[in-house]
């Protein structure tokens, strides 16, 4: 599990994409490659607020491996590492 010095806000999740190893040695331009949809949760926010102002805790935790929507989130780079920040609702499943 990785750690990063970023404070994720609200119901956002910081994901480190896991890229699948390619077989066959064919090199594709980055625009033709399929974006990763699997990653590791690196950091989570404190949750959104309900109508009473109370925090609603996220269901994922740091270290979880997850599947997420292919075009979800915003790609960010921090300390020469690439991450994706997205809403927890863009996560599809936790891998057990």
Curated annotation (Swiss-Prot):
GO terms for cellular component: cytoplasm. Together with the chaperonin GroEL, plays an essential role in assisting protein folding. The GroEL-GroES system forms a nano-cage that allows encapsulation of the non-native substrate proteins and provides a physical environment optimized to promote and accelerate protein folding. GroES binds to the apical surface of the GroEL ring, thereby capping the opening of the GroEL channel. The keyword Phosphoprotein does not apply. It is found in: Cytoplasm. GO terms for biological process: chaperone cofactor-dependent protein refolding. It comes from the Bacteria. CDD domains: cpn10. HAMAP family: CH10 (MF_00580). It holds the Pfam family Cpn10. Keywords: Chaperone, Cytoplasm. InterPro entries: Chaperonin_GroES (IPR020818), Chaperonin_GroES_sf (IPR037124), GroES-like_sf (IPR011032). One of its GO terms (molecular function) is protein-folding chaperone binding. Transmembrane segments: none annotated. Its main location: cytoplasm. This is Co-chaperonin GroES. It comes from Wolbachia pipientis subsp. Culex pipiens (strain wPip). Heptamer of 7 subunits arranged in a ring. Interacts with the chaperonin GroEL. Belongs to the GroES chaperonin family.
